[in-house]
Amino acid sequence: MENNFLTRSECSAMRGIAILAIMLHNYCHFIGRIVQENEYQFFVSNNQRLWQVLTHPDALLPVHLLSYFGHYGVPVFLFLSGFGLVMKYETPSPTPPREGGAFQFVKYHYLKLLRLLIVGFSIFLVVDVLVPGRFHFHWYNVIAQLLMYINVLPEPDKIIWPGIYWFFGLMIQLYIVYRLFLYRQKSIWVVALIVICWLLQVFCDPEGETLNRLRYNFIGGMLPFGLGILFARIPTLGLKCSHPGTKAVPRWEYIATLLLSTACIVTMSFWYHSWFFVPVFIIIGTVASVKLMPGWMLNIVTWIGSISAAMFVAHPIVRRLFITIAWKQDIYDGLMLYVLVTIAFSWVVKQLIDRIPKPKL
């Protein structure tokens, strides 16, 4: 089975876009007067504020948009994870990876995640102690974070700090689900699991704790993750989705796709039942963006994608130090310094991570 839907560089570019969105979102939404996102729960009040800033824009409109929409970088990562698992473990290759049992598979991916988590979390703990207003960690929550089961505990949004590290618990759950239920199984099972996870959420109170807890776990991430698996299993998709230059798809079709996706993302965000499917158009729009990028821009975001894992664990550390500039001085001054330092510090963190031996399957 051959799938040329996304090249390696395009996947890396999508990671670059995703981590930039997440990094900027996690700074902007900490500024008190900025519009808040609907990530785990659906608050009508947040949409009302979004509508207000869209209809009465001011100088802070980009910050509002990054705060509200930036978290959708997470579904892009989930899509790429599902896509990558199929390409690595289900696609014939001259040098196929070793196939261990389910326990070996989960252990291998847990250790890969732990390499990132242990570096970022350790540095963050030191910084958090030194900076005023530190978070009160409890030993049992630290253990839960390191073992990546903290997502299943009550009120995860109040015990996971920094908040973005919830992603590690989500990923280990999705690895378990993939290996036990979806690995080399018929694609109908992927579709069925997506539908089941949607049904478990759709009847919840939009602002309730039940929905919050579901979306902190694999149930909330199954849609983009499952789409990645499905897209990777379509062998002829790449024939219609080549990068511009192959002439397989006219450039105007990508432009139309990007514009339509953007319209759907904004419109569907205002209704509870359509809100669940916004990640679909986020993914489609991101793919279209990558396909449209000129070479020089693709090279930049591809490089950002190459350090995205390090940036993921590093940016909360930099935010902890620089968020006070946005609180006390100018928002854009703080944002610019935050971005520059985050990129530089992420490169340093990557060097530390690379010194830790990689696990073997």
What are these model-derived regions, one by one?
Residues F225, I255-P357:
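Alpha-helical transmembrane segments of multi-pass integral membrane proteins
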Residues S9, L61-V74, P156-L170, C204-L227, ...:
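Interfacial loop-to-helix transition and helix-capping segments at the boundaries
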Residues L20-Y27, L146-V152, I194-E207, T257-F270, ...:
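Aromatic-anchored segments of alpha-helical transmembrane domains
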Residues M1-C197, L239-V249, W327-L361:
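Membrane-cytosol interface segments of multi-pass membrane proteins
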Residues L85-V86, F124, Q201, D205, ...:
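Hydrophobic alpha-helical segments of integral membrane proteins
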Residues V127-V129, Y178-L182, C204-D205, T262-W271, ...:
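Hydrophobic alpha-helical transmembrane segments
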